[in-house]
Amino acid sequence: MKKNIIIGSRGSILALAQANLVKDRLQGNYPNLSFEIKEIVTSGDKDLKSNWENSDISLKSFFTKEIEQELLDGEIDIAVHSMKDMPAVSAKSLICGAIPDREDPRDVLVSKNGLLVTLPQGAKVGTSSLRRAMNLKTVRPDFEIKHLRGNIHTRLKKLETEDYDAIVLAAAGLKRTGLADKITEYLNGEVFPPAPAQGVLYIQCRENDEEIKEILKSIHNEAIAKIVEIEREFSKIFDGGCHTPMGCYSQVNGDKIKFTAVYLDEGKQIRAVVEDDLAKGKEIAYMAAEEIKNKIVK
């Protein structure tokens, strides 16, 4: 077995935090092996004008193409991606080797002026996400939504120094980068469904690398994988891209799932709630999508 395993990751603070979480889990499971992180610059990192980091769903391959190429070329053994950055189909000869434990999928408010309901009339709230913006406006139509780009630290700095009363971010990014203390309020996932697969990591490897596949089994969470399959299918049904305003929130109790989905159409929040057996898998996504499509037609 190869003794030195190289993990490929983007070089952002969040990406490296995620890669280190994976590295630490693997190192704990395989203390006799050495795990090393290699930083890789992606198209998304180069294109500063269109910095999509921490937005809902990136352009397909925007943050993954170069990392996948290094995996194909044998320069790295494992790739760590945010699931939301992954296209529906992996590059040829690459597979998902593991989906580890999920971080909190909810969105959060980071505020100078209190909770969502106590923010002043006409408060200026920053987000780069159309889904988040439209969800906010359904609850607080008085809000002025201001465009906000940049990585997590850049966004927090803009909140401090620019004309924002609050910003909305993913809980997962703040928690993974040690910034959970910045969170003012966790937004109710049933009212503000997050992006599909938010807070989920996608651990990729070569399809023919049996040793790495075996190693990655040690951090795979099959229960999370089943939920992600449903959420990703819902996204796929609506052709989920970076400008598709939709979200979903999964709550599992035993073998049952409560799947809350939302699609924002012409400023209106169209919702569906499906409560059924988790074993139905992708069928849950189709049930929710059908309910939403019927409401759109009406």
Swiss-Prot record:
Pathway: Porphyrin-containing compound metabolism; protoporphyrin-IX biosynthesis; coproporphyrinogen-III from 5-aminolevulinate: step 2/4. Its cofactor is dipyrromethane. It holds the Pfam family Porphobil_deamC. SUPFAM superfamilies: Periplasmic binding protein-like II, Porphobilinogen deaminase (hydroxymethylbilane synthase), C-terminal domain. Signal peptide: none annotated. Binds 1 dipyrromethane group covalently. GO terms for cellular component: cytoplasm. Its EC number is 2.5.1.61. Monomer. HAMAP family: Porphobil_deam. Tetrapolymerization of the monopyrrole PBG into the hydroxymethylbilane pre-uroporphyrinogen in several discrete steps. The porphobilinogen subunits are added to the dipyrromethane group. This is Porphobilinogen deaminase. It comes from Fusobacterium nucleatum subsp. nucleatum (strain ATCC 25586 / DSM 15643 / BCRC 10681 / CIP 101130 / JCM 8532 / KCTC 2640 / LMG 13131 / VPI 4355). The gene is hemC.
